[in-house]
Design a protein with these regions (language model features):
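Structured catalytic-domain cores with a bias toward divalent-metal coordination
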Residues: 1-343
């Protein structure tokens, strides 16, 4: 049976590229680049998005290396593949082109906060609707590849939800750990890709490697290796290493320490004031509840905010730019580690 996403149509044992057209405004179409790989043997469907945020580059780089490589398109590879892969290479093309932080410049909205979207909404809502209905629907597992944004550093982590269905939740943990990140963060986030994928019947997995607008080969390779790890866990077979993985060499997977809670901290300063953010911690730092995490200062050094840790936790991401506005994220903590012990 053929597998199709947009104009990409792949017969069994073939790979196809094409475009998913979304009418993001009357008379305006956004063209999302897509890849479809249809294995020669029946099996599960893996759906993947990358580039939900325009300045997060490791995910798109990983998919381009992994799915567009000569080995990925080799007839022997495709004939042995069980199931299919459908993927977007730049889910928010306008944000990618603009090097935009957090939001889609077409409407100023965060594409990962408007799911499941609307066919008649704003540009981001229409893209979300297209992804939900045409890519997520029918998938067994959904991966959303991210990095820290242009202004963020992070410690590699995976995010999954727990539903209360013991068998399904155990499966989500196994798939999440197959990615090979340092942390496995448990939590639900309404309006996001992975939450919507869960509602549509797929196990949704958020994968975060790299950040700060960089395209570090190690983190690109770890994203690619994570996709292959999930494919192996799904029983799709041994997909060939990407060129970037071969270039980087052997990778050491993270421990995937489970974190059962999280806390985000945001700037709380006057809306008309430009803040100057001076963090006192780094990504991967383990902090105690009540510990000072930094200061947001005014231009002349007056202290506007002294955020402290609301929980014992590890810094999973951190805004690294000096400029800070009211309501902007400062950092996030993951807490309640598995077994109560930090690695």
């Amino acid at each position: 049976m053929n597998v199709q996403l947009g104009t990409a149509i792949a017969a069994p044992g073939t790979r196809a590229t094409g475009w998913l057209a979304v009418e993001t405004a009357p008379g305006e179409q956004t063209q999302i680049p897509v890849v479809v790989i249809n294995g020669g043997q029946p099996g599960p469907r893996l759906a993947i998005t990358a580039g939900i945020h325009g300045g997060e580059y490791t995910g798109p780089a990983a998919l381009r290396s992994l799915l567009l490589s000569a080995k990925a398109g080799d007839p022997a590879t495709l004939s042995n593949l069980k199931g299919s892969i459908i993927a977007t290479l730049a889910t928010s093309p306008a944000a990618f082109k603009a090097r935009s932080i957090y939001v889609n410049p077409q409407d100023g909205k965060n594409l990962n906060r408007v799911y499941p979207g609307s066919a008649t909404g704003s540009a981001s809502e229409r893209i979300a609707h297209a992804i939900a209905t045409q890519l997520m629907t029918g998938a067994d597992v959904y991966l959303d590849l991210h990095a820290g944004d242009i202004n963020e550093a992070l410690s590699p982590f995976v995010g999954i939800e727990q539903t209360g269905d013991a068998a399904r939740d155990a499966r989500a943990v196994a798939l999440g750990r197959a990615v090979g990140a340092e942390w496995l963060l448990i939590g639900a986030s309404p309006g996001t890709t992975t939450s919507t994928a869960e509602q549509l019947g797929a196990i949704g997995i958020l994968c975060e490697f790299g950040g700060q607008g960089h395209v570090e080969p190690e983190f690109v390779a770890r994203h690619a290796a994570g996709v292959r790890g999930v494919m192996a866990e799904m029983g799709m077979g041994n997909f060939p290493q990407s060129p970037i993985e071969r270039e980087v060499g052997p990778l050491k997977p993270g421990a995937s320490t489970r974190l059962n809670s999280e806390a985000w901290l945001r700037a709380e300063i006057p809306a008309d004031v430009a803040g100057y953010w001076h963090p006192a911690v780094g990504v991967g730092s383990v902090v105690k509840k009540g510990e000072k995490l930094g200061e947001v200062q005014g231009v002349f050094g007056d202290v506007l905010q002294t955020p402290t840790a609301p929980i014992d936790g590890v810094v999973i991401f951190l805004v690294t730019t000096l400029a800070m506005n009211n309501g902007d994220p400062l950092l996030a903590l993951g807490g309640d580690p598995e077994g109560g012990v930090w690695p």
